[in-house]
Every structure is written in structure tokens, then in C-alpha cells.
Amino acid sequence: MSKFKVGDIIKARPGWLGPGETGEERYLVLEDRGNKTLVQYIDVDHIFSFGSTHVYADEWMELDPNPSNEVLMTVTDMANGKI
């Protein structure tokens, strides 16, 4: 079972990155099935700076089961101004 919930904004390392490659990105969780998560890449810095975000196509990703994957905030947190 995944620790992510629908609506979470997460920092995660995509599973397709090769050994030695770095690159944690921020994603909005759209659906979670444990081993695969439907996410939408977002530019969180853009939200903080301009109040909006770039939207990219959603995709199923196998997130690296890396302990550094973490929930940054939830959509509810954002709506309540806790960003």
C-alpha cells in the first residue's frame, strides 16, 4: 500500500531514472494503485511565485520505492493557505 493519497503533492524520484541519475520532481497524485501511481507533473515553484502552474499530461509512473519520496502538501493544505 502506498503512502500517497489522491490530491497529495509529492516529491518523488521517477522509477525510470537510471542508477546514479538524480532528479526528484514534484507531482500531483491523481490515482494510486500501490505499485503504480497516476501523477501529473507540476512546477510547484511556479505556484508559489505566480499562483498558477504549468500543466503537463498525466501519466502512470512507477515511483522509485525510495525513502526520500515524500508528501510535500495536500490540495487541502493549499486551499487553506498552508503553503
Feature roles, as predicted:
Residues G15-P19:
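Short, charged beta-turn/beta-strand-edge "cap" motif at the junction between a beta-strand
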Residues K36-L38:
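Short aromatic-glycine-enriched beta-strand elements
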Residues G20-D32:
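Short beta-strand-centered aromatic/proline hotspots
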Residues Q40-I83:
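Intrinsically disordered, low-complexity, charged/polar segments
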